[in-house]
Amino acid sequence: DLTPKVQVYSRFPASAGTKNVLNCFAAGFHPPKISITLMKDGVPMEGAQYSDMSFNDDWSFQRLVYADFTPSSDAVYTCKVDHETLKEPQVYKWDPEF
């Protein structure tokens, strides 16, 4: 079994009040069953899209979840990932670098 490696990033350089896309990319995990949730201030974001699950040469899996959003400087954006290799769901914070 392989633990997911997770990255949270925006499609474009972040600026408060400007529309953007928040991505959460999980890769290198096995088995393929995984839960990935984009959240704003601890609440699941609306309109999240899920790419097709794909796999790498070593048969580990990867998946991208993304959502349109307009970053605000006082909101906290995170990605919660749950997988059987994790004792509990892990939360990864987006660092906007405003």
UniProtKB/Swiss-Prot annotation:
Alphabetized Gene3D superfamilies for the sequence: Immunoglobulins
Subcellular compartments: Secreted
Pfam families: C1-set
GO terms of biological process kind: antigen processing and presentation of peptide antigen via MHC class I; immune response
Annotated PROSITE patterns: IG_LIKE, IG_MHC
Keywords associated with the record: Disulfide bond, Immunity, Immunoglobulin domain, MHC I, Secreted
Record SUPFAM superfamilies: Immunoglobulin (SSF48726)
SMART domains, per the entry: IGc1
Domain Ig-like C1-type: start-end pairs: 4-92
Transmembrane segments: none
Family: Belongs to the beta-2-microglobulin family.
Subunit comment: Heterodimer of an alpha chain and a beta chain. Beta-2-microglobulin is the beta-chain of major histocompatibility complex class I molecules.
Role: Component of the class I major histocompatibility complex (MHC). Involved in the presentation of peptide antigens to the immune system.
PANTHER family noted in UniProt: BETA-2-MICROGLOBULIN, MHC CLASS II-RELATED
Protein name: Beta-2-microglobulin
Organism, scientific name: Meleagris gallopavo (Wild turkey)
Encoding gene, per UniProt annotation: B2M
